[in-house]
UniProtKB/Swiss-Prot annotation:
Region ranges (Disordered): 25-178, 294-386
Written domain comment of the UniProt record: NapA contains a C-terminal cysteine rich domain (c-CRD), but lacks the N-terminal CRD (n-CRD) found in the yeast homolog YAP1. It probably also contains embedded in the c-CRD a nuclear export signal, with which the nuclear export protein CRM1 may interact in the absence of inter- or intramolecular disulfide bonds (or otherwise oxidized/modified cysteines) within the c-CRD.
Record-annotated bZIP domain positions: 154-217
Biased composition annotated in UniProt, kind: Polar residues: 26-64, 299-319, 365-377
UniProt motif Nuclear export signal: location: 543-550
Compositional bias of kind Basic and acidic residues: 109-121, 133-144
Protein name (database record): AP-1-like transcription factor napA
Post-translation changes: Oxidative stress induces conformational changes through oxidation of cysteine residues, masking the nuclear export signal, thus abolishing nuclear export by CRM1/exportin 1.
Gene name tied to this protein: napA
Region feature (c-CRD): 525-558
Subcellular localization: Nucleus; Cytoplasm
GO terms of biological process kind: asexual sporulation; asperthecin biosynthetic process; cellular response to oxidative stress; emericellin biosynthetic process; negative regulation of asperthecin biosynthetic process; negative regulation of emericellin biosynthetic process; negative regulation of sterigmatocystin biosynthetic process; positive regulation of cellular response to amino acid starvation
Source organism of the structure: Emericella nidulans (strain FGSC A4 / ATCC 38163 / CBS 112.46 / NRRL 194 / M139)
This protein's GO CC annotations: cytoplasm; nucleus; transcription regulator complex
Length: 577
């Protein structure tokens, strides 16, 4: 309403020149012919009934206060709309002279564009600030404000913006693709690293397990190759008698193959005839000789049943079954011939009646039985007629040195003496090396390995192939010593090959060496004798030197300088004395 009043007031106070200009501007859009018809002269007269809302020519010269309509009848002087009007207001604005153009009569039809420009400039001059702000807000609009204006479709800025957006979009796509590729690569490398770490862990565990198994096999191989199976056992005075009793024992058992009957392999008549009267050298305990095994397998003599008593009667007593199939030849597995006697002697060395077999071992080596040579009986007999045989340092060292051998005689003297002492007159010593039941234990290095009986299982293929002899082949590393075609050199070659393999493995990796004993803790024979001399009981003769020497021999160790004993063992033994 305020805009309407302002326009209405401008219309009321236009000068005649301004009115002509306004009419010319309004009639410039019409053709000249129509303009002449439409142009009317303004009525100078006043019509009291004209109102500002009616298009009358007389309304330009009359004031709204003198309007004849009844619309303003109730208005007084205080309520007049012209109270705020400034009479000193200048209607002429700077630059208004440039807006006057040619009259409509002098303009031709070709000047249509010029009039349009004048109209446009005139209208732009009359636009207020509000419309200018609206035009600024709509400047980005491509369509023109007037219907005759064509929209701008090809603007360089819009093209650049579109290109920038497309380039940014492509860059983002490439960046996202690159990031996805990197993530996939990292994930793949992570999986490969995890698998490699897992495989390395498994390989390390397997290598450790193989190293443990290799150490165990090296220990077993060292026992077999060095022949130290009985060295530690025979160092005890009582054990020497026991092991010599095993060598003097006439009991021998050859394990036959499961499912086979005794045949020509066990009983070789020709071999028995050639080896029957043959004398061999003194056997070394713990070592089996091929000729002795052949002689033992070929001998045939009469035997007594396991339940009979010792008898010198040359009559043959052989176990006979109900159908009479077994003969006296089958007893050759358990007995052997005494070549020193002129005739066959039936000696009953069975487990139930033999006194030699009772030396701390039963018939099968599993349960102890009462023995004639028990520790109590031996102790009584030794103390009843005891005489001291050591009278000085030299004899003491000689007695103590019997625990070890030398270059000329590698067998300890204690072992030889125990062998000669255990030969009884009822059973004269034989020159043949007849293996007892301990030769099976010697093959395994003198140790009972429970793994052989716990972990080993008979393969199922043996049930179909009737081959049940694989257990003994796996349990004992040595081949069949009882076969005539056996050659002992094969065992040596096999051991050498294994040793060479171990040497090659030692060259590749550092071998774990068990730390040895401290040499400073080992006392020689001279130091032990000096210590005994400092004891008052020894000077008074209250100490049994023979018994003390035998106890020291049990703890003695062989070294390059002679026999040595650990200081702790010496303190323990002397403290008990």
């Amino acid at each position: 309403m305020a805009d309407y009043n302002s326009l209405y007031q401008h219309g009321l106070y236009l000068s005649p020149d301004q009115q002509d200009l306004l009419l010319a501007a309004l009639s410039s859009n019409n053709p000249p012919s129509k303009q002449k018809q439409n142009v009317q002269k303004p009525e100078l007269g006043t019509n009291p009934t004209n109102t500002p809302g009616q298009a009358s020519t007389g309304s330009f010269n009359t004031s709204p206060a003198f309007d004849g309509s009844h619309q303003f009848d109730n208005l007084n002087y205080d309520e007049s709309p012209f109270l705020d009007f400034n009479p000193e207001l200048e209607w002429d604005f700077p630059g208004s002279e440039n807006l006057i153009g040619e009259l409509p009569g002098s303009a031709t039809s070709d000047d249509h564009e010029v009039g349009e420009k004048r109209k446009d400039s005139n209208s732009n001059g009359e636009v207020n600030g509000k419309k200018r702000r609206e035009s600024d807000d709509k400047s980005d609009d491509k369509t023109s404000k007037k219907p005759g204006r064509k929209p701008l479709t090809s603007e360089p800025t819009s093209k650049r913006k579109a290109q920038n957006r497309a380039a940014q979009r492509a860059f983002r796509e490439r960046k996202e693709k690159h990031l996805k590729d990197l993530e996939a690569k990292v994930e793949e490398l992570q999986k490969a690293s995890d698998s490699a770490n897992q495989e390395n862990g498994l390989l390390k565990a397997q290598v450790e397990r193989l190293q443990v198994e290799l150490r165990e096999y090296r220990k077993r191989l060292s026992w077999v190759t060095q022949g130290n199976a009985l060295s530690a056992i025979n160092s005890y005075p009582g054990n020497a008698n026991r092991m010599s009793g095993l060598n003097n024992n006439d009991f021998m058992f050859d394990f036959p193959k499961f499912g086979d009957l005794p045949g020509g392999r066990i009983f070789n008549g020709s071999v028995a005839k050639t080896n029957q009267n043959k004398k061999d050298d003194t056997p070394i305990p713990g070592i089996l000789r091929h000729s002795a095994l052949q002689a033992a397998n070929g001998r045939a003599s009469s035997s007594a049943s396991p339940k009979t008593v010792t008898s010198n009667n040359p009559a043959t007593k052989s176990p006979v079954t109900a159908d009479g199939r077994l003969t006296s030849h089958t007893s050759s597995v358990y007995n052997y011939h005494q070549p020193g006697q002129g005739h066959d002697t039936s000696t009953s060395d069975s487990p139930s009646s033999s006194s030699d077999s009772h030396q701390f071992l039963s018939s099968s080596g599993t349960s102890p039985e009462p023995s004639v040579q028990s520790p109590d009986n031996q102790a009584k007999e030794s103390h009843e007629g005891h005489t001291c045989t050591i009278d000085g340092e030299k004899s003491f060292c000689a007695q103590l040195g019997m625990a070890c051998g030398n270059i000329n005689n590698p067998i300890p003297a204690v072992r030889q003496r125990s062998e000669s002492a255990t030969n009884t007159p009822n059973a004269p010593s034989s020159t043949d090396n007849v293996p007892g039941i301990d030769f099976m234990a010697q093959q395994n290095g003198g140790q009972f390995d429970p793994l052989l009986f716990g972990d080993w299982r008979e393969p199922q293929d043996a049930v179909l192939s009737q081959d049940f002899n694989t257990f003994f082949d796996d349990a004992f590393p040595l081949p069949d010593l009882g076969s005539p075609s056996h050659n002992l050199t094969e065992v040596g070659l096999g051991a050498q090959q294994k040793k060479s393999i171990l040497e090659e493995m030692d060259n590749k990796e550092e071998e774990e060496v068990v730390p040895g004993e401290d040499k400073a803790q080992m006392l020689s024979c001279t130091k032990i004798w000096d210590r005994l001399q400092s004891m008052e009981k020894f000077r008074n003769g209250e100490i049994d030197v023979d018994n003390l020497c035998s106890e020291l021999r049990t703890k003695a160790r062989c070294s390059e300088g002679g026999v040595v004993v650990n200081q702790r063992d010496v303190d323990d033994i002397i403290g008990r004395v």
